[in-house]
Swiss-Prot record:
Transmembrane segments: 34-58, 71-93, 108-130, 150-170, 200-221, 250-271, 284-305
Membrane topology per record: Multi-pass membrane protein
Pfam families (UniProt xref): 7tm_1, Rhodopsin_N
PANTHER family reported in the protein's UniProt record: OPSIN
Cell compartments where the protein resides: Membrane; Cell projection, Cilium, Photoreceptor outer segment
Protein name: Rhodopsin
Cross-referenced SUPFAM superfamilies: Family A G protein-coupled receptor-like
Region (Disordered): 326-349
Source organism superkingdom: Eukaryota
Principal location listed in the UniProt entry: membrane
Claim: Lipoprotein is one of the keywords in the record: yes
Positions of S-palmitoyl cysteine lipidation: 320
Amino acid sequence: TEGPYFYIPMSNATGVVRSPYEYPQYYLVYPAAFAVLGAYMFFLIIFGFPVNFLTLYVTIEHKKLRTPLNYILLNLAVADLFMVIGGFTTTIYTSMHGYFVLGRLGCNLEGFSATLGGMISLWSLVVLAVERWVVVCKPMSNFRFGENHAIMGVTLTWAMGLACTVPPLVGWSRYIPEGMQCSCGIDYYTRAEGFNNESFVLYMFVCHFSFPLVVIFFCYGRLLCAVKEAAAAQQESETTQRAEREVTRMVILMVIGFLVCWLPYASVAWYIFTHQGSEFGPLFMTIPAFFAKSSAIYNPVIYICLNKQFRQCMLTTLFCGKNPFEEEEGASSTKTEASSASSSSVSPA
């Protein structure tokens, strides 16, 4: 059922469909489902805010972390905080009421904040992959990665994020409640006259999903080849084999993290867009949307907490200046010293 600035995934033959801006949507799913949604968002806030905020705090406290290669990791933490503060808190409030109680303006603000955080996070992963490829594989022999390049990378993520999130505010597509109607996203559901949704959805899939996916696969594929070549050149010693396994594991985690975050959402959105009028339940889009939002937790774990340097500094901060695991960390890093150039450049290892 399509209405002014909303789309309910349910036929109105019985006359029960109501505007998600004005009435509870308990006819879509059981009221308990809204409580589960609110609890899940609370879980994301409780875990997502501290780990991302701690990343920023630890970087401010430890000067050795303020290197150009780490700028993009900080940007990733900022993007995740943007999602937590601008999107998750709103969804908790609306799920408690069972509908998008904040109205049309609130929908625009929530949709913009959550989508901007998600897009900046996505493009941060792209820039991170490119930076690692440039540093490890050295496609430009005389190139030296510096602060200006890092700032350019961060600026690119915000520019691409805004290029995706501003158009729906000015008439190219729009933000509408989605799934259980408690959070807002880009309109993949309708071809409403005057909004040019078709062209915007194609633009999103080509420029903000397919292209980033190709870049990430290319960069990490080349990086794995470079690490294997370096290990072979050192005659496959135990230390180089261990470093190679670590880098391979981290690359696989990075790619899986990206796919888990964005592939379900993109696939379902594309299906809905290409099957206009087909029947689907409210959970059909709700679950993939919150797969994407859960990246606020597992992005920091993959890219920051598993980074040896960040992890050591984080433990030092948490334990008031002393890392109780310092001996183990030091022993581990000594064992892989022979291949530190390759593994540290990949960074999350």
